[in-house]
Amino acid sequence: MAYDRPIDTWVFRSVMDKQPRMLTVALNKDLYTCYNLQSGNLYKVWKGGVNYEGAVYTTAHGIQPTSFGFAYVQDGSQQTQWRLRSGAGEEIPEINYLGYSFIDGQVGINLELISKTGKSVKIREIPEYALDEGRSGLVRSFTVLDGASNDLVPVLNYGTDQKLIYKEILKGGERDENGIGVQLSKNAVVKTYFNPVPADWAAPITDDTGMIANGKKIVEGSDCSACHLLKENLVGPAYDSIARRYPFDWATVDVLADKIRLGGTGNWGTTPMSAHPDLSRSDAQNMAYYILSLDAEPEPQERVVDIALNTPDVTFDLDNDDRRGGDNKDKQAGAAVSLYLVNDSGDLYEDLTKSTLPILNGIAPAIHLPTSGVLGEINEHFYMEFKGFIKSDETVNKTFRLISDDGSVLKLNGSEIIDNRGDHGAVAVDAKVGLEKGWNEFLLQFQQGGGGYGLSLQWSDDGKQFTVVPDSVFYHDASAFRKLLPYVAKKVSTVPGDQMPLNAVHPSFDMFQAKPSEFHPRIGGIDFIDKDKMVICTWDATGAVYILKNYNTEDPESIEVKQIAKGLAEPLGIKMVDGELYVLQKQELTKLVDTDGDEIIDEYQKVCDSWNVTSHYHEFAFGLVYKEGSFYATLATDLGSEFKEVKDRGKVVRISKDGSEVEVIAEGFRTPNGIAEGPDGALYVADNQGNWIPTSKIVRVEKGKFYGFKHADWERVKDYKEDPPLVWLPHVEISNSPSQPAILNIGPYKDQMIHGDVTHGGIKRVFIDEVDGVKQGAVFRFIQGLDAGINRTVWGPDGNLYAGGVGSGGNWRHEGRLWYALHRFKYNEKSTFEMLAVRAKSNGMEIEFTEPIASSEFMNIDAFEVQQYYYEATEDYGGPKLGVEGLKIKSVNLSSDRKKVFLEIDGIQENRVVYIHIKKPIKSDEDQSLWSTETWYTMTKKPVDRPGVVNP
């Protein structure tokens, strides 16, 4: 039988209405249900839908999905609705959620009710939509799978608002005299049909963060009620009349927002609507969005803001040259560009240009800068103007789209047509205007605050398909330029890998795409079924699992992609064990089972969820490692001091294969995004900077140790002493958001490790040193120039390295890159000249290279720079380098094979980061340039009686 489900992923796990471990089942466009899997309760039955909000849906941090619409049934209590009845009376059982399965197009939800005696009853519920005389109904079909007897009978206690119930039909069940409990037989069906939604019902606001809630606040706080009421026409139409008349889509939101701001007459009569010029476009859009929601029409899908349009950045030079000379009547190709530094008062737009002059100018062929950083060293706190003419060969209507991060304004022929002001991410604003034949004067104003930036001016003939406004239409004359203030650019290194990121793949590896071009996975986990099949999970709105066949081909378009599961809650770990597939969701370890051999997952079996959770968006679960019969995973913490007493967060945990045991191995982690087994068999974890974590780090996990983060279980751990990491990763210099480590044991890189980075991008390499039993080491740049920030690194059965990328809003991305990637790296056996290892000596530091240094190179103390500093954990977010000290090099000593350099240094201290920079460009005997010039060594323990060799 075919069922009319309203959405593709109609069964999905998430937080819902600020409650964790929820399962939403969208049975029909007129009936949604949601189950609380901790209590086993049917939480809600409603007509409406879901506000898909949060990092994987809208990139917004801090919010989670919420329901909207009319509730027929709602039970927000945490006490279970289930009872077990026996000869001894009735008891409240322990609830053990077992999982759910798909059965002939329906979903079965499995629970175990456990008595105090240890006996239990296993029950499956299949919910379904039904219709009776035009009334929506919920059919709940229960099957007792195991354990029920005359001595142990399941009873479902639930109450309903009888005013909302049209009729109820019980089959195989008997309702108690109190009208609440229903005693279930082995097979029971409860059919409940609901009365229509009351005509006077208005959609309640179920959240306080979305556009509906914000719009309602603005409307209620404005003067709109002088002309409009909710359900009655006044001077203007009633809000609900507007909602019924117009479609709830983004185009209508934009049209109504412009009408609110600009005023004028429309389709409701001759009385003009008052203009509200002081209202921001964002507020007007929120108001329009709220008004259009009042007829309970589903919200439009997230507005797609494609700033890149698969088109490269249109780059141009900015300089301090005076371009004011020349004939103002002589029009030249391109738009005139002026760049201003924002003043201390923070003025922008006309307020800024009236008070100061630009520092740089240039000529832009077109206006398309989706990648932050392409303007050179100035990346924050600036203002730009693009000025000139748009030439049109005819009078024509065009829809302009201005996308900017942060704010922007577009003026055409003296009129402001787009207002995209404000500090925000990449936001698109459209305006349909007429271009006159000939020269159309324009001014585009752009302001950049902090963080990344982006800007693109696009247009369309039909308002649907947009392209970058081409360089063939832009012109300027000399009048567009102003006098410049003096400006001297900073002198910076221009050599990739020399105090700046690399820009390419490591020469010892060849990179291939491990996915077809039209497949855009935001990788949460990677593993392999066999040598022919890769399996991945994706951290996105779908929460999917895919099989990739032929993944190691050199023709990525021939790779076959098959979705086998979906509806998982932010999965960030996946593992094949003994031919069985396991995935780590945000709040559960789950076994995925294909029962009929078609590779599509039929059963989502809970293995374990025996750790505390809340609805906080930052409670990620990362994994997975499997060794010696157990899984190992990491649990991220909540953020903010109000969550100091949340237990079980910030832990490395061991989970037995059957899920019956959960053991805390170590604690004190913040965002431990990645866990792996190292070359010595120990577990290694990448943790991210934040409160109590002054900078990111790689940790070698030791049982029972505490690694610094104190906001989880505050009272117990607040006085704990922090154990040191394997390596500190200085923020911005070598790391921002480190991710899953992996062993590197190929070519000259024996028993080393690598890890990705979501925000800094690329892959880093770690050499592990050991001093008196203490593991410590050095970190190096390794691979860069990838499609996205790297979230997972895994070696395949073919001996190749696979790296999966991810991205989201804010700083959860590698700036200027995509939000998805899947790369394959094949070792090509070519040698790369770089630092292979750095070892601590009692009298200095020894650097080992992969190749001999060229005999023509003269190594002296001027070729090196060495510093040391330390970090201190505080409650503040991150922390600065402390005690920064330049170290004097006494001598530089080259080994006889010219592959090792020993720097004789006095004054190196324990518990410091020792930074070494090779200032002088050097080459190898093979005439290769040095791949990267820096390393950061974590000196937890300084060796004694392990001197480096000082040449006579």
Task: List the predicted regions and their residue ranges.
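The canonical Cys-X-X-Cys-His
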Residues: 219-231, 273, 287-291, 545, ...
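Axial heme c-ligation environment in periplasmic c-type cytochrome domains
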Residues: 235-246, 261-288, 294, 299-300, ...
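Electrostatic cytochrome c docking/interface patches
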Residues: 198-220
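Acidic, Ser/Thr/Gly/Pro-rich low-complexity segments and short DxT(G/T)-type signature motifs
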Residues: 829-837, 854, 918-952
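Extracellular/secretory pathway-exposed regions associated with glycan biology
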Residues: 305-399, 403-506
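Beta-strand-rich N-terminal accessory domains
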Residues: 1-126, 130-132, 137, 157
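Beta-propeller blade termini and top-face loops
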Residues: 369-375, 486-828
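Short, surface-exposed alpha-helix to beta-strand junction/turn motifs within ectodomains of secreted
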Residues: 852-891, 916-923, 933-937
